[in-house]
Amino acid sequence: MELTSRERGRGQPLPWELRLGLLLSVLAATLAQAPAPDVPGCSRGSCYPATGDLLVGRADRLTASSTCGLNGPQPYCIVSHLQDEKKCFLCDSRRPFSARDNPHSHRIQNVVTSFAPQRRAAWWQSENGIPAVTIQLDLEAEFHFTHLIMTFKTFRPAAMLVERSADFGRTWHVYRYFSYDCGADFPGVPLAPPRHWDDVVCESRYSEIEPSTEGEVIYRVLDPAIPIPDPYSSRIQNLLKITNLRVNLTRLHTLGDNLLDPRREIREKYYYALYELVVRGNCFCYGHASECAPAPGAPAHAEGMVHGACICKHNTRGLNCEQCQDFYRDLPWRPAEDGHSHACRKCECHGHTHSCHFDMAVYLASGNVSGGVCDGCQHNTAGRHCELCRPFFYRDPTKDLRDPAVCRSCDCDPMGSQDGGRCDSHDDPALGLVSGQCRCKEHVVGTRCQQCRDGFFGLSISDRLGCRRCQCNARGTVPGSTPCDPNSGSCYCKRLVTGRGCDRCLPGHWGLSHDLLGCRPCDCDVGGALDPQCDEGTGQCHCRQHMVGRRCEQVQPGYFRPFLDHLIWEAEDTRGQVLDVVERLVTPGETPSWTGSGFVRLQEGQTLEFLVASVPKAMDYDLLLRLEPQVPEQWAELELIVQRPGPVPAHSLCGHLVPKDDRIQGTLQPHARYLIFPNPVCLEPGISYKLHLKLVRTGGSAQPETPYSGPGLLIDSLVLLPRVLVLEMFSGGDAAALERQATFERYQCHEEGLVPSKTSPSEACAPLLISLSTLIYNGALPCQCNPQGSLSSECNPHGGQCLCKPGVVGRRCDLCAPGYYGFGPTGCQACQCSHEGALSSLCEKTSGQCLCRTGAFGLRCDRCQRGQWGFPSCRPCVCNGHADECNTHTGACLGCRDHTGGEHCERCIAGFHGDPRLPYGGQCRPCPCPEGPGSQRHFATSCHQDEYSQQIVCHCRAGYTGLRCEACAPGHFGDPSRPGGRCQLCECSGNIDPMDPDACDPHTGQCLRCLHHTEGPHCAHCKPGFHGQAARQSCHRCTCNLLGTNPQQCPSPDQCHCDPSSGQCPCLPNVQGPSCDRCAPNFWNLTSGHGCQPCACHPSRARGPTCNEFTGQCHCRAGFGGRTCSECQELHWGDPGLQCHACDCDSRGIDTPQCHRFTGHCSCRPGVSGVRCDQCARGFSGIFPACHPCHACFGDWDRVVQDLAARTQRLEQRAQELQQTGVLGAFESSFWHMQEKLGIVQGIVGARNTSAASTAQLVEATEELRREIGEATEHLTQLEADLTDVQDENFNANHALSGLERDRLALNLTLRQLDQHLDLLKHSNFLGAYDSIRHAHSQSAEAERRANTSALAVPSPVSNSASARHRTEALMDAQKEDFNSKHMANQRALGKLSAHTHTLSLTDINELVCGAPGDAPCATSPCGGAGCRDEDGQPRCGGLSCNGAAATADLALGRARHTQAELQRALAEGGSILSRVAETRRQASEAQQRAQAALDKANASRGQVEQANQELQELIQSVKDFLNQEGADPDSIEMVATRVLELSIPASAEQIQHLAGAIAERVRSLADVDAILARTVGDVRRAEQLLQDARRARSWAEDEKQKAETVQAALEEAQRAQGIAQGAIRGAVADTRDTEQTLYQVQERMAGAERALSSAGERARQLDALLEALKLKRAGNSLAASTAEETAGSAQGRAQEAEQLLRGPLGDQYQTVKALAERKAQGVLAAQARAEQLRDEARDLLQAAQDKLQRLQELEGTYEENERALESKAAQLDGLEARMRSVLQAINLQVQIYNTCQ
């Protein structure tokens, strides 16, 4: 606590800070006159000048904003020293203070400390009543400020603050706030004491109203009580540094009278008066000076003055040593510290300059070592320390760095050196620098960089690299060191290279390379290239058209080089008399010795005319005639005449000819097969010639005189062979031409054109032949392969032979070979003429029509005529007058009419009755059930006429009943009486009695009598309170725990609603389990009836989030306790996060050993109190622990004490209000009243016309005011006395309240413990839980007794259930292998079907219809196809030379008309079959539904048995678990066992055994159904296979149908032929799509069969596919037979024609043709047999399907009986199941209750 001046005057010593400051001030004043030497301390670290009063010598720099008497005398009064008589004085500060002349001057300069004898005679005083006054000190430099002492003459200020500025008043910062009421004067400012050395706080201890005089205000910048981590830190220095100091006085202390009386006299005693102001500090030199000198303009000889100009050390300068001296800037300026002077260091410039500056970036880059940068380096030096030489100078290594001549000029050629002649400035081995070394440009060398490198030329100063690189191609330059001239840059080239850069080959050469000569010759092909020149880079020669390869020696793909005999004319194509053409068949595997289709027989005197349209080149051609002699040694003389279109121009190549040159004679030698006429013929391109060949005479022996009577000469062709030796490639005269000619003759390359058969030319001839061909034909010729007859657009590059399709010949593959016809997109087809019915194996080239014998018919002469069968022995068809034709092979009638069917139309079809074999009367008539077939009201499968009653008996379809099948059967609904009406199966999910006529509504089909606990319009939902799958008859009652189930979902205690599918009960919050019988994880207290509560275990103090399900106790870690483990462990208290303490309780006085877990207060028994329960409580007496209740009167006194405590509390509240409002707050109403009176007085005084009455009123009011003020003063005095008494009473009351507070805490602890117990009791539902436990205990014992009885009896329900389960498992194992085998069989069938689908293609269909396979684009296919359209957008199919339906129009007109009628009949029959198949499908669907329902019921019954068994096992396991629990005491075990033994099963052991046997028997009977249906799997697979065969037959028949329709239209009108064919293809495409869709359906059904092998109902669905196969097979067989019959008829017609031709010149080939026809007939018979086999298989399959359907109906009746028996047994099982559930529920409840008891 600070001491006042008065107290110090009474002998108290001064504070040590002030004494030290005074001592330093005196010492500084003493030493200020002479400069002091450097203090040794400055060299070791920081040093500081002496501290003194900064006001000494600076009185003129001290100002005040308010001073009394500056403008004249001003009165003022004092409130202290009341013992003096004079209390008011005058202030006159117009002149400075003088004790003798002007003692009443109170300027601010009076506060400066002086050592005058009467220093209290002078002070500074402000003007009266001004609260805001400022005192400011403006210093001339920066100073260290340590503390401030202010000694006041009057009251200290009620509020003030001290501010500082370190920038000469530009910005200000607050040091400290002082206030009597900090919250009111400086809101938001923290209160003292400060916690940190730079905290700005508000302090109140220097603002009290006492003492009234000589009160002090002391402020230290650095509080000694607060530790300072670093006194030399910049923040500390900035806090001490000031240039200005300002004291703001903001509020005066008053006595409150100024609020009542605004007169000037009242304010005269309220002002600021200051005796002394001491500002302690020293000169601020940053630790670089120990003394200071007067600053400029400051007094130099003021005694005791602290000067402001530092006498700097450490190489610093400036007013405050804030800078380094010049040339001492190698380190950054820093304030000195203790032990470290941070002196400025001299720059190192090596004597080359005397100026430097500091660079922070340089300093940081050097690692804080050096930051000085030299300025203005001399002597050609540079660098931060002048340690480098300037550019174009280098350091002389022989001289010292400080030598002025250390840097020398560089000697480098500026043209070849870098940077214009700069050299290395110094030596640096690491960087490869050599002082003075020139740095040449990249392409320059030399010591001075004066010459170009090897391979470069043209040294230049403007070139960045110095020299230019020699532009010499290394491949064309002579190897050596210098590739070019260093001055001109010209390169030295190799022998075959030219150019400035040796980068080009000489003409005729290419491929610049590193070879010795540099380039290679072009070597262009003499014929394939246009000239001998080639590309220099690639060597590519300039090729003739369609020649490729670098040398132009190869033929472009799609083109060929012609053979020498390319110019060939066939004799078959010549003109002349009637030509005798002889066609030859090519033997497979042999090469023909002729060209074309054969020969022309030429007799003596006959002439052939060859038309030569053009030749490729004007030159001489040799005439080559190819022929074949007819007899050995045949010779001939021939003459050939050239007929030109006009005279030959004389200037043309052939202008030298004379007319006799065009007539040439030739003689054929014996055994020769060709003839070369002796003289050539000259021909020119672009001119047509006629060559006439005449056979002058011929003979068969060597003697021409012998007459010859044999056959003529067979002429094959005429060939023009160019005379190639006259070409320039042979006749050029150069060495190469001579070599080529010699090679051509040596290897006889000309023989290539002599014979038709070609072999590969030799290696020597091949290039010459290619060159010859390209010369003659100016390149290669296009292949022009016929797109329909060839397999590729490319041909053999030698000769141009295209790759032909089967049966196609010709170089371009554009002709059919002999024995083939119908040239088209697929090539040509073999004639295949029947050897029995045809005259020859050759046929017509376009239609393929063979020459038939008499009686044969058809395209191949291989069948009978229409209406007959059995080729070649044809017989009439037998069809009972109901069909016009039959199968040509089997005789089966085709297209039976009049509703008949059978092989001979001998029976009525389904839906009709009668005998079609009778000639009249018993024809087939429709069955009236109730209407005939084809109508919408026909509901019978068939009918018959009763032999006795002659009535029609209808066989109704399933779902119909009545004499005429006019009503719906039970279990069905609908209205069959109306058109389109039908009966449908009631969809009741198998939950009705199908024999009950009232089970469903007969009109709407709504289910009315649902069974098996189901409901809904389709019995598809379980009733409320039940759950399961209604479709499987497995609805079970909901089993819900009442404690965990939402009570709103339980209408009664024994019935609750649950999820109808899963059986999940509606649980309360945080309850789980299907029966809502357990809390969710981390929850507890199920017995509350409101859901489970969270465990809320502490996350880190509990072992896990789980807790006891019944008590909620978490599993605590060691050291923790409480229910949630958030408290200390048992018998401990405290905060477990900090520290736990053991309960320190006196065992003699506690109620429970556990103390309060947070306060540690022990829980005392009645009459005991204290924190440890070790003393008697209030109201008890005696010595602990013998505490006895006090006398009865204690209660009365205790009430009095409590009343006093209440009064004390009220007084305390009143005192707190007075503290907040002040003393004046109690007189607020009186003050208001006084102010009103004063207002009246002021009004009267202020009035101008004042009367006597008003004056009297004024006097009265004044007196009243004085009286009231006096009363208020007395009241205030009384209140002050009362306040003192109240404070004493308050102290006593506080002491009493402390005891009451301890009692209150003990009571609160007891109350909280009681609340906890009460909450536990509330949450535990104690009464209800107790009743539930007691009731459950009895039930559990009963359940235990019954369970033991059921489990231990022999036989028991448990053993019976296990036996039934074992039998069921054995039965399933027995059926396992059968199931697997069926599954594998279906997998194999599915694989076969999938493989077959991949083989299907539209190519054959398109080929048969349009004549093209349809696999080529429409633009390139001449016959069109599916989806093709012509230029007009019309569909395009067929055409000329197309082997499709259009091409055979002239052969099938009659067949087409007959086919149309038959197709109409077949469509009618197909419609009837379709209706029957639809009915069969519906029956199969209904049978499947019934079978599925039966299987579902059987599975449901089995599921119920298994579920009962499972629940019984769970029951037994629950009992075992309970008995094995650790907390189960013997009494509980005995009780549970008794309860279980008391349980009884509502059926005897014998009854359960009998019931299980009956169920097993029914299950075995149901297994027979699976076995029977399993046997149908083979039939299903067989039906699927037949379906595929029938579809293939149908596809073939549909193609024939479309072909016939196209034939009919084409014969009627040729213009419409293409349109009708397009219609046919549209139908074929539609049928194809149908076929694909059917195949897709088949795949889907097979996949469905695989998925449903375990369901007997799914197998019944396969009957649909079986019947569909029958329908398709029937239609396909009919169409196939019709087509076969037509083919036979056509064959018969052709046979008759062939018979006529047989008598002609073809008789010698009859046997060959007959053998071929027999082979074809065998193929037809095989197809007929296959069709008959398919028909028989289809008939057998239909019969088998009907038998299976009848068997299923019988099984259905048997199944219904079994179902009723199962329902009866199921009812008994339901009873057992309900009883078992109740037992299980009782046991579970008992287990929960016993667990809770535990």
UniProtKB/Swiss-Prot annotation:
Changing L1258V: In NPHS5; uncertain significance. Disulfide bonds join C283-C292, C285-C310, C312-C321, C324-C344, C347-C356, C349-C374, C377-C386, C389-C407, C410-C423, C412-C438, C440-C449, C452-C467, C470-C484, C472-C491, C493-C502, C505-C519, C522-C534, C524-C541, C543-C552, C783-C795, C785-C802, C804-C813, C816-C828, C831-C843, C833-C850, C852-C861, C864-C874, C877-C886, C879-C893, C896-C905, C908-C924, C927-C943, C929-C954, C956-C965, C968-C983, C986-C1000, C988-C1007, C1010-C1019, C1022-C1035, C1038-C1058, C1040-C1065, C1067-C1076, C1079-C1092, C1095-C1107, C1097-C1114, C1116-C1125, C1128-C1140, C1143-C1155, C1145-C1162, C1164-C1173, C1176-C1187. Residues 1190-1409 are annotated as: Domain II. It is found in: Secreted, Extracellular space, Extracellular matrix, Basement membrane. Residues 561-777 form the Laminin IV type B domain. One of its GO terms (cellular component) is synaptic cleft. Residues 1443-1798 are annotated as: Domain I. Residues 43-282 form the Laminin N-terminal domain. Residues 1-32 form the signal peptide. One of its GO terms (biological process) is visual perception. One of its GO terms (molecular function) is extracellular matrix structural constituent. Keywords: Basement membrane, Cell adhesion, Coiled coil, Disease variant, Disulfide bond, Extracellular matrix, Glycoprotein, Laminin EGF-like domain, Phosphoprotein, Repeat, Secreted, Signal. PROSITE patterns: EGF_1, EGF_2, EGF_LAM_1, EGF_LAM_2, LAMININ_IVB, LAMININ_NTER. The gene is LAMB2. This is Laminin subunit beta-2. Glycans are attached at N248, N368, N1085, N1249, N1308, N1348, N1499. Binding to cells via a high affinity receptor, laminin is thought to mediate the attachment, migration and organization of cells into tissues during embryonic development by interacting with other extracellular matrix components. Residues 1350-1363 have a biased composition (Low complexity). Residues 1338-1364 are annotated as: Disordered. Residues 283-346, 347-409, 410-469, 470-521, 522-552, 783-830, 831-876, 877-926, 927-985, 986-1037, 1038-1094, 1095-1142, 1143-1189 form the Laminin EGF-like domain. Residues 1410-1442 are annotated as: Domain alpha.
